[in-house]
From Swiss-Prot:
Family membership: Belongs to the cytochrome P450 family.
Pathway named in the protein's UniProt entry: Mycotoxin biosynthesis
Task performed by this protein: Cytochrome P450 monooxygenase; part of the gene cluster that mediates the biosynthesis of sirodesmin PL, an epipolythiodioxopiperazine (ETP) characterized by a disulfide bridged cyclic dipeptide and that acts as a phytotoxin which is involved in the blackleg didease of canola. SirD catalyzes the O-prenylation of L-tyrosine (L-Tyr) in the presence of dimethylallyl diphosphate (DMAPP) to yield 4-O-dimethylallyl-L-Tyr, and therefore represents probably the first pathway-specific enzyme in the biosynthesis of sirodesmin PL.
Name assigned to this protein: Cytochrome P450 monooxygenase sirB
Domain of life: Eukaryota
Enzyme class: oxidoreductase
The keyword Iron appears for this protein: yes
């Protein structure tokens, strides 16, 4: 339905109104059209979805909760059939959803032309709480690429140690069945384990843990709260006013990080050769400053907390998806356990070599991401500084937002055999085939290609995926090795996901029964 059709007014009403009334109606109609209709879209690109007014009038599911459906429709009708973009509102903003033929441009074009940070800032309204933190510099990315990723091998024992503490703290030795919420368990395990690398010893301070989790949980809810309202030019001010509680959560968490940041800054000022910790707080302090304000203690605190948001939420959701999958497909549980036990026994525990040989677990992670990716769409970018032209001549004006159809691509039968079915060892078999044929294996859980986009694509793909997959292996591997678990209540179907603004969120309500395994070996 055309958006203009949503604003038709019955002639029977019009002939009874005065000139003043008509002027008021005309003004309100024009204002509403201004707010409801996107400006400056590229001619010839078709829109999918439904207007906000239509869903209000008809009672249909609003588009922001129905993007899985319209992502598929647009993919089939435009991306696949015509190899063309389509337009859809995501996060209340127009996005061009591009066919995969345009992915290669993301490999070479830098963030000054096509910016993921600008997209993130705009669709989650990050500036309502953190100002220009994610757009002013790439220091947050540099913490991951220049410090975290090169240290992952040496950080493995640290992660394992903290995972052991997290399991002891959250579960301990359970001789009888205990009922827990699956997502809450995953979230606490993930946040405790991640925290050791992000904030060092502060991770074991429960006051900090709860304050940080309250902040990270409100990033998404605060960032999308008003997207169902056509705010137009008032979007930023409305989100700023609406984010007061979120900013309070941020302040509370920052107040617990700031003393440690200030202590270290003072120690380094007194003695540049002083002992340094091996965590994200220190890596922030060691980075060259993009500008003087990036060196302020509060700015460092905000960067650490935003990194915590990025490092924990998606991993907790992924682990919960994996719990649901292994309960719905129990035939995978024992082979996964056997692999974990064999690898840890052969290599003396959760070592780098042990994890590198957990091929079935790696496959299970990748298949979960294929079927239940973090979002219907990924590889978001915003055109900056000047119009951007793709190799085939398709041109987008400055300010245009693009993305790619991750879930439809992952479930496309042209990309995967029996694509709609969950096959936990799909990529393990590919690995075995490659090994027997003496060919390179390109289907590891962190490997990105044009048919696997959960981590984005190109030179701004998720740099934290290596850290995320490593934590997932440790936490899920220890969970299945050390504990038995089942649904708290019998289920015949997998809990339905919740999709908001294209984000695929795990159903937060299911509970599981859990107890220690008698045969647990590690």
């Amino acid at each position: 339905m055309s958006t203009l059709q949503d604003f038709q007014i019955a002639p029977a009403i019009l002939h009874r109104v005065t000139v003043r009334d008509a002027s008021a109606i005309l003004f309100c109609t024009l204002l509403t059209v201004f707010l409801f209709i996107s400006q400056g879209t590229v001619r010839g690109v078709k829109r999918v979805g439904k207007s906000r007014l239509r869903t209000l009038v008809t009672g249909e599911t609003p588009l922001r909760f129905d993007l899985e459906k319209y992502g598929y429709l647009g993919y089939q009708q435009f991306s696949k059939k015509a190899n063309k973009p389509f337009l859809v509102k995501i996060y209340g903003l127009d996005h061009y959803v591009l066919p995969v033929k345009y992915l290669d441009s993301l490999k070479t074009v830098d963030h000054h032309r096509l910016s993921f940070a600008q997209s993130l800032n705009d669709f989650l309204n990050v500036d309502a709480s953190l100002g220009d933190l994610v757009t002013h510099s790439d220091m947050e990315i540099a913490v991951v690429t220049k410090h975290l990723n090169p240290r992952l091998t040496t950080l493995t024992p640290v992660l394992v140690d903290e995972a052991n503490f997290a399991f002891e703290k959250e579960l301990g030795k359970l001789e009888t069945w205990k009922t827990v919420n699956a997502l809450f368990l995953s979230a606490f395990l993930t946040n405790r384990t991640s925290g050791r690398v992000l904030v060092g010893d502060l991770c074991r301070d429960d006051n900090y843990l709860h304050a940080m989790m309250k902040y990270t949980e409100s990033v998404f809810s605060s960032g999308v709260a008003f997207n169902g309202i056509p705010l137009g030019p008032f979007r930023k001010i409305v989100y700023y006013l609406g984010a007061r509680q979120h900013r309070r959560d941020l302040d509370n968490a920052a107040a617990l990080v700031l003393p440690e940041i200030k202590r270290r800054m003072a120690a380094q000022a007194e003695d540049p050769n002083c002992r340094k910790e091996n965590d994200a707080i220190q890596w922030n302090l060691d980075l060259p400053l993009a500008s003087p304000k990036e060196g302020l203690p509060l700015r460092h605190a905000h960067r650490v907390l935003h990194l915590s948001f990025a490092a924990t939420g998606t991993v907790a959701i992924l682990i919960t998806h994996m719990i649901y999958n292994v309960l719905m497909y129990p035939e995978y549980l024992e082979p996964l356990r056997e692999e974990v036990m064999a690898c840890t026994k052969a290599h003396g525990g959760w070592t780098e070599k042990a994890m590198n040989e957990m091929w079935k677990l790696d496959s299970f992670i990748r298949e979960t991401l294929r079927v239940q990716p973090p979002s219907v769409f990924t590889a978001y970018r915003t055109v900056k500084n000047q119009p951007f032209t793709f190799p085939d001549g398709f041109t987008l004006p400055v300010g245009s937002r693009i993305t790619f159809p991750t879930l439809p691509v992952g479930l496309d039968p042209e990309n995967y055999e029996s694509a709609s079915e969950f096959d936990g060892f799909r990529f393990f078999r590919k690995r075995e085939e490659a090994r027997l044929a003496k060919k390179a294996y390109n289907w590891g859980a962190t490997k990105i290609d044009s048919s696997f986009l959960p981590f984005g694509y190109g030179n701004q793909a998720c740099p934290g995926r290596f850290f995320g997959v490593r934590k997932t292996k440790i936490l899920f591997g220890k969970l299945i090795n050390d504990y038995d678990f089942s649904w708290a209540e019998p289920r015949s179907a997998r809990p339905e996901n919740i999709v908001i603004e294209g984000q695929i969120l795990v159903n937060p309500t299911p509970e599981i029964k859990i107890k220690s395994r008698v045969a647990a070996g590690m």
